[in-house]
């Protein structure tokens, strides 16, 4: 058995560094979303800002102490929130590419993305519940912030983002070019390159065995 004692100052510095890294990562993600998805990306950036504010307010309201595992849970939930927005925007682009109006594409895009988002988030929420019930103190901290983040991310992506998208359309941003173009799907011949993938897998296994040995 191994144990470590970490001083209060070192713990505070670690938490502060983690929060700064999370903030920088969030800003980078926002910039990427704006560049990649144009108007929907701007909407996603606002939604993520609202989401982050809601998470902080919820932690303060329930007096949840922020720890390193807790920060990890928040960062993971932010990633899931971004993933949900990406799914929605991809569906909207597909609808626009099929010739539908922007208004119809927005409504249909959210409807098509709903099941995938709910499935992924509910599965993770169940895992967080199990960790919270069966885990130790630090694991429970991770599970609690992850659960809070998932619930709030579902709310922001399915409600807040949708309201903002309709608001942007209502104020006059209705040209399809501002919502991006769907990328053409190029088929990849996995079966034809089976030998290459087997060779790569074997090389990785050998390297892993050598590293462990």
State where each predicted segment sits:
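Interfacial helix-loop-helix hairpins and adjacent transmembrane helices
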Residues: 155, 159-208
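Short helical (or helix-break) motifs at transmembrane helix termini and adjacent helical loops
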Residues: 77-97, 117, 154-159
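Interfacial segments of transmembrane alpha-helices in multi-pass membrane proteins
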Residues: 12-67, 133-137, 192
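Small-residue-enriched core segments of transmembrane alpha-helices in multipass membrane transport
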Residues: 41-63, 74-81, 142-157, 205
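A cross-kingdom feature of multi-pass membrane systems that activates on extracytoplasmic/periplasmic
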Residues: 1-8
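Single-pass alpha-helical transmembrane signal-anchor segments
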Residues: 25-34, 196-212
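Helix-loop junctions and hydrophobic alpha-helical segments within the transmembrane domains
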Residues: 96-122
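Transmembrane helix-loop junctions at the membrane interface of multipass transporters and ion channels
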Residues: 63-65, 127-144, 212
């Amino acid at each position: 058995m191994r144990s470590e004692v970490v001083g209060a100052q070192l713990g505070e510095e670690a938490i502060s560094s983690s929060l700064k890294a999370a903030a920088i990562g969030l800003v980078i993600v926002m910039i990427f979303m704006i560049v990649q998805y144009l108007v929907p990306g701007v909407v996603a950036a606002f939604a993520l800002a609202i989401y982050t504010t809601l998470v902080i307010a919820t932690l303060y309201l329930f007096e949840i102490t922020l720890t390193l595992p807790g920060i990890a849970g928040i960062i993971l939930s932010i990633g899931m929130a971004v993933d949900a927005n990406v799914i929605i925007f991809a569906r909207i682009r597909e609808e626009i590419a099929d010739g539908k109006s922007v208004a119809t594409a927005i409504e249909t895009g959210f409807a098509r993305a709903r099941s995938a988002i709910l499935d992924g988030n509910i599965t993770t929420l169940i895992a967080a519940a199990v960790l919270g019930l069966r885990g130790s103190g630090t694991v429970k901290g991770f599970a609690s912030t992850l659960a809070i983040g998932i619930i709030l991310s579902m709310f922001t992506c399915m409600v807040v983002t949708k309201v903002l998208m309709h608001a942007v359309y209502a104020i006059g941003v209705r040209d399809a070019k501002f919502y991006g173009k769907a990328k053409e799907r190029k088929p990849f011949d996995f079966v034809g390159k089976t030998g290459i993938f087997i060779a790569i897998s074997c090389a990785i296994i050998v390297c892993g065995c050598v590293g462990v040995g």
